[in-house]
Amino acid sequence: MLSMFMCNNIVDYVDDIDNGIVQDIEDEASNNVDHDYVYPLPENMVYRFDKSTNILDYLSTERDHVMMAVRYYMSKQRLDDLYRQLPTKTRSYIDIINIYCDKVSNDYNRDMNIMYDMASTKSFTVYDINNEVNTILMDNKGLGVRLATISFITELGRRCMNPVKTIKMFTLLSHTICDDCFVDYITDISPPDNTIPNTSTREYLKLIGITAIMFATYKTLKYMIG
């Protein structure tokens, strides 16, 4: 079951991850000065991850290579255009998420690899993943486990060779991960924005947080379409 590898690994490292990065975040936050869309529900698809999967296995002819080149160009232009349209506030959240998710991935590389290897032997739907993540986040309120979950889900996206299905997974999981606790953590790190109306601050920040998580997978998308 999916719960075996997620609960037995992510949850086991929650305290270590929280204790290891919260102080760093508080230290760096003191220097951080410059910083009605409805998402479609994903299909009930099954994921099977295999770290030995090589994209070269799918590029056997010249036509395959040319099509991949065209696909990469079009996708990259679209991603770049979407990124340029984001407001400064959202980009500041992207920077924060990138920095600390990368830190978690690097500092806990061995632990993450254990989870990735276990995931490579399992088949499960995106709803299985979402349910387990939701349970974990309800039981654990720390920032570390949320950053670890983003890093973990992003890596699963790298190992799934279907970009369309992976985007759907990111869409659903971004809503689940971006709960009130995560919004509070990120907004505490980020400098205040006086342009946000007080009456809708939380709703606005939650929407911005979801958008930021989606674009925090920017490098992953480039990896998949490259």
Curated annotation (Swiss-Prot):
Biological processes annotated in GO: regulation of apoptotic process; symbiont-mediated suppression of host apoptosis
InterPro entries: Bcl-2-like_sf (IPR036834), Orthopox_F1 (IPR011207), Poxvirus_F1/C10 (IPR021119)
Record's protein name: Apoptosis regulator OPG045
Compartments reported by the entry: Host mitochondrion outer membrane; Host cytoplasm
Predominant location: host cell
Function, in words: Plays a role in evading host innate immune response by inhibiting host inflammasome activation. Interacts with and inhibits NLR-mediated interleukin-1 beta/IL1B production in infected cells. At the host mitochondria outer membrane, interacts with the BH3 domain of host BAK and prevents BAK from binding active BAX. In turn, host apoptosis is inhibited.
Record keywords, A-Z: Host cytoplasm, Host membrane, Host mitochondrion, Host mitochondrion outer membrane, Host-virus interaction, Inhibition of host apoptosis by viral BCL2-like protein, Membrane, Modulation of host cell apoptosis by virus
Cellular component, GO, one term: membrane
Keyword Metal-binding: no
Residues forming coiled coils: none
Induction, per UniProt: Expressed in the early phase of the viral replicative cycle.
Quaternary state and interactors: Homodimer. Interacts with host pro-apoptotic protein BCL2L11 (via BH3 domain). Interacts with host NLRP1. Interacts with host BAK.
Family statement drawn from the similarity comment of this UniProt entry: Belongs to the orthopoxvirus OPG045 family.
Gene3D superfamilies reported for this sequence: Blc2-like
